[in-house]
UniProtKB/Swiss-Prot annotation:
Entry GO terms, CC: extracellular region
Protein name: Laccase-2
Keywords for the protein's UniProt record, in alphabetical order: Cell wall, Copper, Disulfide bond, Glycoprotein, Metal-binding, Oxidoreductase, Repeat, Secreted, Signal
Lineage: Eukaryota, Fungi, Dikarya, Basidiomycota, Agaricomycotina
Similarity field: Belongs to the multicopper oxidase family.
InterPro entries listed in its UniProt record: Cu-oxidase-like_N, Cu-oxidase_2nd, Cu-oxidase_C, Cu-oxidase_fam, Cupredoxin
Gene from which the chain derives: LAC2
Organism expressing this protein natively: Cryptococcus neoformans var. grubii serotype A (strain H99 / ATCC 208821 / CBS 10515 / FGSC 9487) (Filobasidiella neoformans var. grubii)
Length: 594
């Protein structure tokens, strides 16, 4: 066993924590909106993955401390209250090797509960660490703490972590999570020379609480019932807003973020969409991009000028920095795909890709032009896995048959909450999710119970083997990115309309090495058949990753091996989160209506 690597990013203005991960209580008061806040910062160097990181198959323990606090920040030039992690926006990068144990001590100084999800990691044997309040745990209370511990097994690639409580991810609680392996198909030094993270997200000038409460009200947000377009686009935590539109005299126009890459190299760019709403289209002037990874699966993909990426997805591309000399600069363009927005305006976020060498860093802005074949604003929103065949580099064929198949019909509609209030929301199988946040479904099943089908749609698979999940997006004009917790899936087939169980025997499926992902963009009025192996006991969330849709109930669960779940041993620290809480209470709006 390798040595313990402690990487504690401590917020300097907080007093020392004394056994907080054991007591569940913090010695410092939770955030008070009336108290002046520290200023959260963005460190561009964290998005540069160092060649000094040792990629090895010798497992070790990587330990982090996350302090969640309120702070002030103006990542796009407009100052607002944010949720920072260790006074960073976005939060720290977690970097590990396959086989490593990751320990994260989360100290919650906020005025609301929290839970941290490790997006894309399977959590083999550690379902209770998946980080979803009301599904796999009770919330980390204000002034409380909790330690997540899990081993990264049989996975490598690009992942990320984020809050799964309400839509506070949109306030800043997220960060990249990169897993290396000496056995992964893409090798540093052979397939690429340098490694960079490019994380994109929409950014609102209002806090997520304000937006969610408005969306579930009759008035809507900014007079509309539909999720908003961002006020700005952030690239690696920085962007540029329209200061004139804000009406704020203190608004500034910051320089665009920069991504420095050595000249004459092969550079891997790991794109992560942490957006709460839009699909983005990303291009780099003068540079073609070879797609080599999606959602932690190394693939053979096309070389293209522009990628599309929806919330929760990750794509790695390789570019060759041979289009100029040291000091040259090129625009990286991130545009909102307007065809899948209810309403919207043309919005482009810019970053500078700058060639570096042995000399000093230049500062001139690029004068490059966009590719002439980029998508138009009204081009239909189509995922890359639908436009191209992304063939996994590690061959895994699918069986002709499955043990069982379940259907989840996804649709916007009128619903009534547990308090008798009527609202327009989203659901699966005519059920909108309402979250009994202090009685997690994983614990319900462990006690021998079942999921309440009037509160959440669910699919249960009792036995180990290949099983099918059919998602029918019945919203004819609304696309959704669906994310599966606890496993990746093989994309067996997709098409227009809806697929029923009666149709399945006559449906052509992809059996030869299907694309493997954990997040899939589905156009309105379409179906997709996802194949999983039901070998990881747990209650796993399956939901739309548009945070504002999730706020209005677009969540289901997949229950895998309920008999095995009954054998889970609950650590005392996990049980303490639920102590002295009302098990009949309903949770925040991202999971229900209140």
């Amino acid at each position: 066993m390798g040595g313990i690597i402690k990487l504690s990013f401590l917020f300097c203005s907080l007093i020392s924590l004394v056994n907080s991960e054991n007591t569940g209580k913090l010695p410092t008061a939770i955030s008070d909106h009336s108290v002046p806040k520290a200023t959260a910062t963005t460190d561009p160097s964290v998005f540069v993955l160092s060649n000094d990181f040792e990629i090895t198959d010798v497992p070790t323990t990587r330990e982090y401390t996350f302090n969640l606090t309120e702070a002030l920040a103006s990542p796009d030039g407009y100052e607002r209250l944010v949720y920072a992690v260790n006074n960073m926006l976005p939060g720290p990068v977690i970097e590990a090797n396959t086989g490593d144990t990751v320990i994260v001590h989360v100290n919650n100084y906020l005025h609301e509960g929290q839970g941290i999800h490790w997006h894309g990691l399977r959590q083999n044997g550690t379902a209770l660490m998946d980080g979803v309040p009301g599904i796999t745990q009770c919330s980390i209370p204000p002034g409380g703490s909790f330690t997540y511990q899990f081993t990264v097994s049989h996975q490598s690639g690009t992942f990320w972590w984020h809050s799964h409580y309400s839509n506070s991810m949109a306030d800043g609680i997220w960060g990249p999570l990169i897993v290396h392996s000496p056995n992964e198909p893409l090798q540093r030094g052979r397939d690429y020379d340098e490694d960079r993270i490019v994380a994109v997200t929409d950014w609102m000038h209002d806090e997520s609480e304000t937006i969610v409460e408005a969306l579930i009200s009759s008035e809507g947000y900014r007079g509309r019932p539909f999720p908003p377009q961002g006020d700005a686009i952030l690239i690696n935590g920085r962007g540029q807003t329209n200061c004139t539109a804000t009406g704020s005299p203190s608004c500034t126009y910051p320089p665009p973020p920069e991504i420095h890459v050595p000249v004459n190299c092969r550079v891997r760019l790991r794109f992560i969409s942490a957006a709460s709403h839009p699909m983005y289209r990303i291009s780099i002037d003068n540079h073609s991009m070879e797609i080599v990874e999606t959602d932690g699966t190394a693939v053979y993909g096309p070389t293209i000028h522009e990628i599309s990426i929806s919330s929760g997805e990750r794509y790695s591309v390789i570019i060759n920095t041979t289009e100029g000399k040291e000091g040259d600069a090129f625009w990286l363009r991130t545009s909102v795909a307007l065809d899948c927005m209810a309403q919207g305006v043309t919005q482009v976020g810019l970053a500078v890709v700058r060639y570096t060498g042995n000399g000093s860093i230049t500062t001139a802005e690029p004068r490059t032009e966009a590719w002439t074949d980029l998508a138009r604003p009204d081009t239909p929103c189509v995922g890359l896995d639908e436009m191209y065949h992304l063939s996994p580099r590690e061959l895994v064929n699918a069986s002709q048959t499955a043990l069982e198949s379940r259907v989840l019909d996804s649709k916007l509609g009128k619903f009534v909450d547990v308090y008798g209030n009527s609202f327009e929301g989203y659901g699966f199988n005519n059920v909108t999710y309402q979250n009994q946040i202090n009685d997690p479904l994983l614990y319900v099943v462990q006690r021998g119970g079942t999921c309440n089908s009037s509160l959440i749609a669910n699919a249960t698979f009792a036995d180990i083997g290949p099983v099918n999940i059919i998602i029918n997006n019945l919203d004819s004009h609304i696309g959704h990115p669906y994310h599966m917790h606890g496993t990746e899936f093989q994309l067996m087939g997709r098409g227009t309309g809806a697929l029923t169980l009666d149709d399945l025997p006559n449906t052509n499926l992809t059996l030869d090495n299907p694309t493997r992902k954990d997040t899939i963009w589905m156009q309105g009025g379409s179906w997709a058949l996802l194949r999983i192996i039901s070998d990881n006991p747990g209650v796993w969330a399956l939901h739309c990753h548009i945070g504002w849709h999730l706020a209005k109930g677009k969540m289901a669960v997949v229950v895998v091996q309920p008999e095995a779940i009954k054998k889970i041993q609950w650590p005392e620290s996990w049980m303490d989160l639920c102590a002295n809480t009302d098990p009949n209470a309903f949770g925040p709006a991202r999971r229900s209506v209140s």
